[in-house]
Structure formats: structure tokens, C-alpha cells
Amino acid sequence: LDAVICSEVLEHVDSPQESIEELIRVLKPGGILALSVPRYLPELICWKLSNEYSKTPGGHVRIFKHNQLKKLGTINGLEYQNFHWAHGLHSPYWWLQCLFWKTKEKSFFVKQYHKFLVWDLMKQPLLTRVLEMILQPMIGKSLVMYFRKPI
């Protein structure tokens, strides 16, 4: 494959190393691998707000720091290219989910913020696009990293 995307998966698996090996196996030389995982600080806040969050079956079993994800790629022979943060508006939603863990979707605050995110996704108004760009470096929910498989 010329490009492989592994989005929000590695935090769920028992062996990220085995997963990376398989992703590299199917990637052509010169191909690009894009990895995204929950960003360390926003994810840590989720773990602190709710003891149940990290214990959910099939849920997140680890939190990656920037350098850990970068090392996972480079020790497997990939060339690090770049990174960015994403989903600056999404961290508060997950914090609300964790804060109101027992009632989650029934919580007024969770429901209202979810409506806001759906509205933003569908309408993409300039105000929230700018707000998202401002928030991403501070509280972006996801870390997205790009690697290249050597030729």
C-alpha cells in the first residue's frame, strides 16, 4: 500500500509493537504511515476524572507520550516526517463524559456538548474553525504522526 492510516487504535491493543510491524509489512517502500492516538495530557485528564474510563472493556489500555509514539516508529526503521494535533474542540467533550461517567449520554452537559460538536462538524462555521486551530496546540485530543518507510 502507498499509504496506511492507523487512527485511534494503538491505545487499545495489547502489543503496539506487533501492530506496527504489521502496518509496516503492508506498506510499500517509500510509503507513508499515519498514526493517531489520544494525546497525553487530555487523555491523562480523562483517566484522572474517571476511574472507570481506563477500565472499560476494549477501551484505552495505555497513554502515549509524543516521544513514545515517535520512538515506536523509528525503532522499527521508519523515518519520522512530522506531527500535528487534532480535535481541539473534542477534549472538553471527553472530560464531560468522564466527569459524568455514570450518566454519560443522559447528562445534560454531555448531550449539549455533543450537539455542539455535531453542529460544528456539519456547519463548520468560521468561528469554531478558528477556535479549533487555537485550541489544538493546547488541548487537541489527538496526536497525529507521520512516518515514511525507507526505499
What are these regions (language model features)?
Residues 1-46, 66-73, 145-149:
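Conserved SAM-binding loop
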Residues 9, 59, 79-82:
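Short, flexible active-site loop motifs that bind/organize anionic cofactors or intermediates
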Residues 13, 63, 137-138:
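Short, solvent-exposed loop/helix junctions and linker helices
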Residues 17, 31, 53, 80-81:
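Secondary-structure boundary/capping signal
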Residues 32, 56, 138-140:
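A generic fold-level signal
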Residues 48, 81-151:
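A C-terminal cap/extension of S-adenosyl-L-methionine-dependent methyltransferases
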Residues 51-68, 85-86:
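Acceptor-substrate binding/catalytic loop of class I
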